[in-house]
Amino acid sequence: MDRAPQRQHRASRELLAAKKTHTSQIEVIPCKICGDKSSGIHYGVITCEGCKGFFRRSQRCNAAYSCTRQQNCPIDRTSRNRCQHCRLQKCLALGMSRDAVKFGRMSKKQRDSLHAEVQKQLQQRQQQQQEPVVKTPPAGAQGADTLTYTLGLPDGQLPLGSSPDLPEASACPPGLLKASGSGPSYSNNLAKAGLNGASCHLEYSPERGKAEGRESFYSTGSQLTPDRCGLRFEEHRHPGLGELGQGPDSYGSPSFRSTPEAPYASLTEIEHLVQSVCKSYRETCQLRLEDLLRQRSNIFSREEVTGYQRKSMWEMWERCAHHLTEAIQYVVEFAKRLSGFMELCQNDQIVLLKAGAMEVVLVRMCRAYNADNRTVFFEGKYGGMELFRALGCSELISSIFDFSHSLSALHFSEDEIALYTALVLINAHRPGLQEKRKVEQLQYNLELAFHHHLCKTHRQSILAKLPPKGKLRSLCSQHVERLQIFQHLHPIVVQAAFPPLYKELFSTETESPVGLSK
């Protein structure tokens, strides 16, 4: 009699192990919806966590999405968030359903077909063992591994390639982009190039700057001349560049102190860097600007807004956490494509992304903001602050809307957002950097590129209007504070339902609550 419970317990463990084996085998098959790494069978179809969550949310609120094109948008890992209508239709066409049967109830024919596909995927992986592989986080991954996998960094290695799911990043002149902690790896060739009728080359003199007691452009609020900041212009002065000076809490001015022994930067190289950053940005935009503009008349009705307001706090937080995580994944892809970023050590890549990813998302949000009626694009339509009332953090939402409103007043071009967000991300003042010199070099290159582009387009005036760094930090701090309050109220929801990457970046508690199995 005493052995019966033991046999039942052993049988349960064996059944659990068998199910786990089946699940791990299934995960070798990519998501049927977008091609990302799958995490098992969800609603009857092999999908990734992202598509599973998207389908669950669409069914909860009986969402009625619309397509701005011809209802045939491609759905893959990089485009899946651009058209919710086509994504949902693909989910339904492939058989996703709330009433779908589970794996254990599949027919023999279905199981045999699934087994054959698993074997096919395993064979393909064996053939590709000699090729570079970009890892993706396993379902439920937590801690630093999540961001490491998202970056595509194998343990102990630092590949320089980009994700295979995105177009290849364009190459830039190695002289300008090499980030070396020691030695003059920067291009030493003097180049003369025409810009708005002016012919010039830039020279930086660290010794001259130190002799005059200046730390950087960030250390003074007064206007600086080329002589004061260590720039030398030959033949003609570059219009505007030498006169740009901002306060210590601004992204607007070059921190020339940061450059190593790197005397010269040709305008040709700077222009190439501008083009590279803008291309990387275009390839990693979550939503196309033309689609956002086309949807501005598509506003949530009063009934739809009421529906959002009646949602529980935890459901609304979960929704926003998933949307924010998707946006951050695009920022990670953007970072990987910034020339020189993947040459940084793994620690510094993670430090920069943990500190700057949310800030970049906040800047990018201004594209999805309509200043005419103070609404933002969310889940297929535009809505105001009242849409997010269920979150219980009206002050944070109001601050974010105000920030987007102030940025939209600058009328950023897409290229300006690209260069500005690159500077927001590559910030050598982030605490915890191991090779600060390399980050300073990258930051300096991007500062030159940003200023070059603004001078070329006669937009130098926006530098004085850029929000201070402290504003972005304040918004991020408010977000973390509100998350901590929510996490205190609903620890199990955060642990079980929030994306691992979101928890790694923002949550202060990574331990599972008592009684919650991993």
Curated annotation (Swiss-Prot):
Effect recorded for residue 327 to F: Completely abolishes transcriptional activity
Family statement: Belongs to the nuclear hormone receptor family. NR1 subfamily.
DNA-binding region: 31-96
Phenotype upon changing residue 378 to Q: Completely abolishes transcriptional activity
GO biological process terms, semicolon-separated: adipose tissue development; cellular response to sterol; circadian regulation of gene expression; lymph node development; negative regulation of thymocyte apoptotic process; negative regulation of transcription by RNA polymerase II; Peyer's patch development; positive regulation of circadian rhythm
A single Gene Ontology CC term: chromatin
Region annotation (Modulating) ranges: 1-30
SMART domains in the record: HOLI, ZnF_C4
Domain notes: The AF-2 (activation function-2) motif is required for recruiting coregulators containing LXXLL motifs such as NCOA1 and NCOA2.
Species assigned in the record: Homo sapiens
Protein name (database record): Nuclear receptor ROR-gamma
Protein biosynthesis keyword on record: no
Recorded name of the encoding gene: RORC
Biased composition (Basic and acidic residues): 109-118
Impact noted for substituting residue 38 to L: In IMD42; does not affect nuclear localization; loss of transcription regulatory region sequence-specific DNA binding; loss of transcriptional activity
Upregulating conditions: Up-regulated in the state of obesity.
PROSITE patterns: NR_LBD, NUCLEAR_REC_DBD_1, NUCLEAR_REC_DBD_2
Motif (AF-2): 501-506
Tissue: Isoform 1 is widely expressed in many tissues, including liver and adipose, and highly expressed in skeletal muscle. Isoform 2 is primarily expressed in immature thymocytes.
Zn finger (NR C4-type) location: 31-51, 67-91
Tree of life domain: Eukaryota
Stored InterPro entries: NHR-like_dom_sf, NR_DBD_ROR, Nucl_hrmn_rcpt_lig-bd, Nuclear_hrmn_rcpt, ROR_rcpt, Znf_hrmn_rcpt, Znf_NHR/GATA
Disease implication from the record: Immunodeficiency 42: An autosomal recessive primary immunodeficiency characterized by increased susceptibility to concomitant candidiasis and mycobacteriosis. Candidiasis is characterized by persistent and/or recurrent infections of the skin, nails and mucous membranes caused by organisms of the genus Candida. Mycobacteriosis is characterized by infections caused by moderately virulent mycobacterial species, such as Bacillus Calmette-Guerin (BCG) vaccine, environmental non-tuberculous mycobacteria, and by the more virulent Mycobacterium tuberculosis.
Feature: compositional bias, Low complexity: 119-130
Organism placement in taxonomy: Eukaryota, Metazoa, Chordata, Craniata, Vertebrata
